[in-house]
Amino acid sequence: MYGDYRQIWERIVEVIKSELTPTSYNTWLVHIKPLAFAEDTLFLSTPNTFTKNIINGRYINIIYDAASKVTNRFIEIKILSEDEEEYREIKESIERENSSESTLLSTLNPKYTFDTFVVGNSNKLAHAACLAVAQSPAKAYNPLFIYGGVGLGKTHLMHAIGHFINKNHAGYKIMYVTSETFTNELVNSIKDDKNEEFRNKYRNIDVLLIDDIQFIANKERTQEEFFHTFNTLYEANKQIVISSDRPPKEIPTLEERLRSRFEWGLIADIQPPDYETRVAILKKKAQSENLNIPDEVLAYVAEKIQSNIRELEGALIRIVAFATLTKSNIDLELTKHALKDIVSNKTREITVKLIQEEVCKYYNIKLEDFRSRKRTKNIAYPRQIAMYLARELTDLSLPKIGEEFGKDHTTVIHAYEKISNEIKQDESLARQIEELKKRIKGY
């Protein structure tokens, strides 16, 4: 996403040097080497654990700040010492990719493999389908369409497919890309008059793993280009794996010809993990990080954090960081203190503005269009859904809700009754409403 990770680190180093004295930099930070960059995490290495601990204790915030300045966004920093098992695993993974007869045309997170994926009732179909595709590309399910909410493991499974094929199928060209990157590259190819180069890149491969396909909704030129890319690969019997936050029929403004193609193969969903799976995920994470976490702590976290895997693992990292900084043992009391902000913030205040913003994001429309007088279906219908949700999730009066939308109360009544009736008959709409309620409530 940001070019070669070594170049990223070089730019970060320049910023760090401007913040530190030469003595501080040359004593400690000069020993850091860039190891890998995947899924918004920059992996760095140090010669030994002592140096790693000094850097984590004194300089990590400076590194975070410098990384944010260089990339214009937050990226995770993970420092590993060369005597750690995780360092050796990542190093070996990179060497395998570089020496493999297959060609990996994009960076995959070395931690996202089938071995590190925790299987439960909520994801076992998606896991089985992905494993089948990895074992027999273009012979099992083609295309494979995976959908589910944020942080549930879709990207993990796609990277796992890439790693497995790269390791076990010689000669395959494998491409992982987000649909946002696909769109940006298309725009640049048009601007620079390099359309043919762009097409050759995406049509002369054996496996295409494209993440977050819902991003191309409302983008006519991107949909047109992806349609032809899909056809070229499919007709050549190449494997296509697609992920989204919702099933094809629920992606708004997606062209029908693309929607039908996405439904040609297998569609597998991933649901939020149940309690037992959440505990298993936390245990796996603790084990991979060589952390000794009491069972009662894992049980508490699994009970309180129910939304997705990313938040579960984030809570565990927060607990460990809190214990390290305060030089305390990890127990239930410390855990409750470390997570008090996260747990209490789960009941955030619900306003009409919040509802409007979440509905706009979900249906990929602009907030200014949403509040305008436009009556096209792709705007008017989500607006009615937002009115319905405002009536369901707030205590505001009908006139007040209408005022927030620039409408009168009779319009709100009509919208509420319309959506209420349609939910009873349309399972797809009912799922969309439930998903929106979760997003609005913050879990």
UniProtKB/Swiss-Prot annotation:
Q: List locations, semicolon-separated.
A: Cytoplasm
* Annotated region (Domain II), positions in chain: 73-106
Spell out the molecular function terms from Gene Ontology. Answer: ATP binding; ATP hydrolysis activity; DNA replication origin binding; lipid binding
Q: Where are the membrane-spanning stretches?
A: none
Q: Which domain of life is it from?
A: Bacteria
Q: Where is this region: Domain III, AAA+ region?
A: 107-323
Region Domain I, interacts with DnaA modulators, as annotated, extends over: 1-73
Looking at the keywords, is Membrane present? no
Keywords of the record: ATP-binding, Cytoplasm, DNA replication, DNA-binding, Lipid-binding, Nucleotide-binding
Q: Write down the SUPFAM superfamilies for this protein, in alphabetical order.
A: P-loop containing nucleoside triphosphate hydrolases, TrpR-like
> What does the domain comment read?
Domain I is involved in oligomerization and binding regulators, domain II is flexibile and of varying length in different bacteria, domain III forms the AAA+ region, while domain IV binds dsDNA.
Write out the function statement from the record: Plays an essential role in the initiation and regulation of chromosomal replication. ATP-DnaA binds to the origin of replication (oriC) to initiate formation of the DNA replication initiation complex once per cell cycle. Binds the DnaA box (a 9 base pair repeat at the origin) and separates the double-stranded (ds)DNA. Forms a right-handed helical filament on oriC DNA; dsDNA binds to the exterior of the filament while single-stranded (ss)DNA is stabiized in the filament's interior.
User: What is the name of the protein in this document?
Assistant: Chromosomal replication initiator protein DnaA
| Gene this chain is encoded by | dnaA
